[in-house]
């Protein structure tokens, strides 16, 4: 499953919580239910657009989510491995960004967003990068365009490959490729058998 995770959007006034934090929390719960249904019921789908992903995660009866329900019969309702890939707009742990102390109210690092990531992982997903590199510091996948952040490696790790636990024995490696330019993000890589 790949999709764009909504950002909770930083506030206009410094020191306040992100503007869309409540929406982000609802979305996270719906997305967790959705990807667990993909795994548990063997539902086959790919979220091909932001709108389709939002509809699917929010439980919308039209569009992708409805198609997914129909596909469950074709898939036989058996368990299916799931990999979530992309920009999840959250740095899960303090180790996942350069300046955690000054960012606890920043979109992508609020306690609420980090807790939702913990809930997703505890529902049966593995953070593949941390599986192989539990203590590696200064490993980031996103840098602001401001203040020469990339050159100084003042970044956040917000791009992930999350895999269901049944894939863990097949994981070979997971990497971040910071030397590949092209945007404010760099590629992340997962090798699986």
Language-model-detected regions and their locations in the chain:
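Active-site regions of metal-assisted phosphoester/phosphodiester hydrolases
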Residues: 1-193
